[in-house]
Amino acid sequence: MRWILHGVLFVALAAGVFSLLPRLGGLTRDASGLRHARPAFIVAAVVAQAASLGCYAQLYRRILAALGAKVRFRLAADVVLASFFVSHLTPFGSATGTLVNVSTLEADGIEASTTGEGIALTSLMSTVALIVLFGTGFVATAGRHLSRTYLTIAGVALFLVVAVLAVVFAVGAHPAIAGRAARRLARVARRFRPGIDPEQAAQTGSRLASLARSALSGRAFLASFGFASGDLLFDLLSLDLMFLALHYQPGFGPLAVAYAAANIASAIPVTPGGLGVVEVTLVAITVGFGAPRATAVLAVLGYRIVNYWLPLLPGAVAYLRVRLRSAKAGPSRPSAG
């Protein structure tokens, strides 16, 4: 029953986003411009999106290898796509996606704790790459004639993300600090969730910081950061290609700022996969940088079809594959002991 309710809400939300945004953009008279869209750029956007997902699978695979758990690329890609499928179909779906991830790799002999650590470190690297992308985009917009309001807001945002990045590296370099920070956060969280153990949280925080120091240092860090950046840049390229398909080029700076801001906003688990949040943020910021509203709405909706909806098809196939894999591995576990 809960899955049916989630499905109804999901369809209603998607229908609302994809029907309301065109009206807000005044597309009833401008949608005829789609006839002049360049198909080659749309196909290239799909290819860029596939490359983005491949980079993310390689990032996850690289992190797991640094933790001592080696998996084939095919399995890593299946896990990523299956987790994507689940997390993008249910509210607060990241928890369900994590369970799919853990159970699949357990069937391959990887402990749940290692998988959890791999997921956390993968998210950390993606966050670092996203912050760097935002800062780069902000610097790239420095020569533009922008409103004082934008410069003030963007300046504050840049200061905050740099501060967060500094805190992340400081905590990662000192496991004791990470443990104390986790303990304090757990004490605050225990007011809302009494079952949270601050000491256990402190141990987990210290362990993750130690793992980050060992697994994400030197060449391992450069390789992981490269794959994380590749994931974001190919995804950003997919968005840019959608604009180019409609004969408009926003420029790297504005697009990077809009993209990073949309991804940061989508981290708040209001809707599955940031549905609605990403679209509105991308349209608002690109229009603020001078993009025609109708073009921005069409490009963003096209990008989200490629970025959000299209991967659900291989995601469904991957989900069935990993479920069958787990089911086959289940009966054989007792005999393995």
Regions found by a protein language model. Name each.
Residues 28-34, 105, 204-216:
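A short amphipathic helical element positioned immediately N-terminal to and/or at the very start
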Residues 51-58, 63-65, 88-99, 267-278:
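Short helix-coil transition sites and intra-membrane helix breaks within transmembrane domains
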Residues 55-82, 243-258:
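Membrane-embedded helical hairpins/re-entrant loop segments and their flanking transmembrane helices
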Residues 67, 243-268, 272-302:
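Membrane-interfacial helix-loop connectors
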